[in-house]
Amino acid sequence: MSRRYDSRTTIFSPEGRLYQVEYAMEAIGNAGSAIGILAKDGVVLVGEKKVTSKLLQTSSSMEKMYKIDDHVACAVAGIMSDANILINTARVQAQRWDRNHGFQLYMSDPSGNYGGWQAAAVGANNQAAQSILKQDYKDDATREEVVQLAIKVLSKTMDSTSLTAEKLELAELYLTPSKCVKYHVHSPDSLTKLLVKHGVTQPAAETS
C-alpha cells in the first residue's frame, strides 16, 4: 500500500505521512554518529567513521566533516549523496550572508526542521548521546573541555568495542588571536594523542 505514496517527497499518504522523509530519517538513525557541541570560545564537531581501511589516505579522506566557508563547517550523518547536495547549496548561501552573531550550532533533518542547539547528536545511538550531553554539558565550557566531552560521548555510544583514531573525525571552529575564524580538522596523530590524553585508549608500547 505504501508503495503508491513513496515515490515523491511531496506525496502524502492517507495518514498524512511522507514516506520518503521517513526513509531519510531512518537512514540517519542507522548512520555513524555525528555530534556537535558549542563552547564559549568555539564549536567542536566529532563523527564516527564507518569506512576504515589501511589503504585509505587518511590525511585527505573525510567522511563526516565538511567546510562550508571560512566561518562555517558541518558534520553529517545519513546518505552522503544527499548530504553533498545540501553542502553545495549551503556553500552558495554562505557566500551571500555575512552577519555576525558569534559562534552558533544548528541541526537540521530531512523534514526541513532546524534549530539552534548548545549540544546535539544525530546518527546511531543518538538518544544515548543526547542523554550524556544533557547530563555533562556546561554553558561556560571551554573548547578543550568540549573536545573531552565529545570524545567521551562518542566512546560510550559507538557500536564498536573501542574508539580509535581510524574510527574518528574531529573538527574545531574557533577564533585565532588575530580574530580570524579558523577551521581545523585533527590529523590521525593528533586524534591518537587526544584519545590517550583523555584515557580512551592506552599509549602504544615502544618497540626496543
Curated annotation (Swiss-Prot):
SUPFAM superfamilies: N-terminal nucleophile aminohydrolases (Ntn hydrolases) (SSF56235)
One Pfam family in the UniProt entry: Proteasome_A_N
Database matches in SMART domains: Proteasome_A_N (SM00948)
GO cellular component: cytosol; nucleus; proteasome core complex, alpha-subunit complex
Cellular localisation: Cytoplasm; Nucleus
InterPro entries: Ntn_hydrolases_N (IPR029055), Proteasome_alpha (IPR050115), Proteasome_alpha-type (IPR023332), Proteasome_asu_N (IPR000426), Proteasome_sua/b (IPR001353)
Family recorded in the similarity comment: Belongs to the peptidase T1A family.
GO biological process entries: ubiquitin-dependent protein catabolic process
Cited PROSITE patterns: PROTEASOME_ALPHA_1, PROTEASOME_ALPHA_2
Assembly and binders: Component of the 20S core complex of the 26S proteasome. The 26S proteasome is composed of a core protease (CP), known as the 20S proteasome, capped at one or both ends by the 19S regulatory particle (RP/PA700). The 20S proteasome core is composed of 28 subunits that are arranged in four stacked rings, resulting in a barrel-shaped structure. The two end rings are each formed by seven alpha subunits, and the two central rings are each formed by seven beta subunits. The catalytic chamber with the active sites is on the inside of the barrel.
Role: The proteasome is a multicatalytic proteinase complex which is characterized by its ability to cleave peptides with Arg, Phe, Tyr, Leu, and Glu adjacent to the leaving group at neutral or slightly basic pH. The proteasome has an ATP-dependent proteolytic activity.
Domain of life: Eukaryota
UniProt entry keywords in alphabetical sequence: Cytoplasm, Nucleus, Proteasome
Cross-referenced PANTHER family: PROTEASOME SUBUNIT ALPHA/BETA
This protein's record includes keyword Lyase: no
Protein name: Putative proteasome subunit alpha type-4-B
Source organism of this protein record: Arabidopsis thaliana (Mouse-ear cress)
